[in-house]
A protein has these predicted regions:
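Conserved loop->alpha-helix
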Residues: 1-119
Length: 119
């Protein structure tokens, strides 16, 4: 579960086609070991759920970047399939018991995409 409140903004640094989808790598000064700005993201671990532009993804690799595998269905149902290197994405870690809830309960499980036709 997430709150929907953005915690970090990261730049897409790599997009690769993999079996069944795409590998997405993002860099963030907030998680870079060279930036000195680690807390509260210093304890990230593989398998952790991270919201990337509102989509719940499992972290598969950490370091000075974060890596996620995005399956084909998620690419079709979300805007992640439109990403290009250099784009910025919003990140949020999943809630832990006892965390303050400053937003709303958000699962990050996407059903479909919509199109704005008028403003």
């Amino acid at each position: 579960m997430f709150t929907g409140i953005i915690e970090r903004v990261s730049k897409v640094v790599e997009l690769n086609t993999v079996a069944g989808g795409m590998r997405l790598k993002v860099f963030s000064e907030a998680v870079s070991s060279t930036s000195g700005i680690l807390a509260p993201w210093q304890d990230l671990s593989t398998g952790e759920s991270i919201s990337v532009d509102g989509v719940c993804l499992s972290l598969i690799e950490t370091g000075d970047f974060l890596a996620f595998d995005v399956i084909e269905e998620s690419l079709r149902r979300t805007s992640l399939g439109d990403l290009q290197c250099g784009d910025l994405v919003n990140l949020e870690r999943s809630l832990k018991i006892g965390d303050r809830l400053g937003g709303h309960y958000v699962t990050g499980h996407i059903d479909t995409r919509g199109r704005i036709t008028a403003q």
